[in-house]
Amino acid sequence: MAASALRGLPVAGGGESSESEDDGWEIGYLDRTSQKLKRLLPIEEKKEKFKKAMTIGDVSLVQELLDSGISVDSNFQYGWTPLMYAASVANAELVRVLLDRGANASFEKDKQSILITACSAHGSEEQILKCVELLLSRNADPNVACRRLMTPIMYAARDGHTQVVALLVAHGAEVNTQDENGYTALTWAARQGHKNIVLKLLELGANKMLQTKDGKMPSEIAKRNKHHEIFNLLSFTLNPLEGKLQQLTKEDTICKILTTDSDREKDHIFSSYTAFGDLEVFLHGLGLEHMTDLLKERDITLRHLLTMREDEFTKNGITSKDQQKILAALKELQVEEIQFGELSEETKLEISGDEFLNFLLKLNKQCGHLITAVQNVITELPVNSQKITLEWASPQNFTSVCEELVNNVEDLSEKVCKLKDLIQKLQNERENDPTHIQLREEVSTWNSRILKRTAITICGFGFLLFICKLTFQRK
């Protein structure tokens, strides 16, 4: 058959393996003609065509075969139904068609529900979210657990699907349920390093004090897996977000967390999630989330907040208690600014050697802090754009700032080299100057050494004379 008659892409089905291929999801290409199914086919042939249509995601052929009498809940390999397979590959269109034809959204096979299959599917979060919302709209239970006692929200938290987590909670998912190892959804998010999911779960009432069966809290799990930011977030805050949305009704929670997709005519009502920005993350980490609206109203960015003076805090309505928390965080960051402009001209000209040395040491220390900070950002920055969950501006803005940083670093390097050459020149001139007058400190040090040696010598002679005198008296 000509290659042009071939359609579709091969897609792997299911999450298990078997030596038997007689009743499996066949991987391959489906030969489709433009004609409808006009003649009756043997039931086995229809099933084979149905499997192939499901495999390549051919929605039209699936509908035709269902019209011809194929059961929407047919059992295939491993006892899976077509709906479970469609959910496993996050094919939202197939899920919609099968549900509209009466497929059972609450079907389970070996304690594996279709909702769990959708939450653990390999696909984009957008498609997974659509599948999950379709299943929940058909009364799929969000709290049914698998054999390992893991619920759908645990799978979503483990795989980093923030929007799916929010949607499940909005439909009644329990956030503090524990699996066979004592892991909660929060523990899974901390283990995998999903910071935004950690923040959202705390807001939705997750208990960060629940321990695993080996006695580990989520913060300790995060630390063990080297997610230090999440460790700090869970360890050093009083969990001000806990239970913030627990008292809301289901409808209010959905409105609070989710926003509806504008394309209602084509798609089912799907949801989007508003991610945290850097300011919100900083404030939540300090337990100051109540300041978010205040700072946004005054157009105060995180960078502005970190450089505020005490009078600016008061002017912007920030209480002294909140000021102390922010200043303590800044002290931990060890970011200190050298105020050269505050030095008088006379001080600049007559600065002592000790003061100049302290200045150089402080400057070097700050450079070290900057290097460490940049290295930490490089380590934590996701290499895959799909993993970025915070609100980011255009990447072009970041690259332009980085270019300015590179230029400033090069300029700083040039200035430091000039300073080094100047100091070396002064040192050489001083060593070669025959009229150089010794510093008072050096003279005083030399004089003190002479006095000490003289005093010791006199005491020694005196002690020797005293012994000789005693000896003569005895004789």
From Swiss-Prot:
SUPFAM superfamilies registered for this protein in UniProt: Ankyrin repeat (SSF48403), Pseudo ankyrin repeat-like (SSF140860), SAM/Pointed domain (SSF47769)
GO cellular component, one term: cytoplasm
InterPro entries noted in UniProt: Ankyrin_rpt, Ankyrin_rpt-contain_sf, Asz1_SAM, SAM, SAM/pointed_sf
SMART domains the UniProt entry points to: ANK
The keyword Repeat is annotated on this UniProt entry: yes
Protein localization: Cytoplasm
Phosphoserine: modified positions: 17-18, 20
UniProt region (Disordered), positions on chain: 1-25
Chain positions of ANK repeats: 45-74, 78-107, 110-144, 148-177, 181-210, 214-243
The protein's role, per its UniProt record: Plays a central role during spermatogenesis by repressing transposable elements and preventing their mobilization, which is essential for the germline integrity. Acts via the piRNA metabolic process, which mediates the repression of transposable elements during meiosis by forming complexes composed of piRNAs and Piwi proteins and governs the methylation and subsequent repression of transposons. Its association with pi-bodies suggests a participation in the primary piRNAs metabolic process.
Protein name from the UniProt record: Ankyrin repeat, SAM and basic leucine zipper domain-containing protein 1
Organism listed in the record: Homo sapiens (Human)
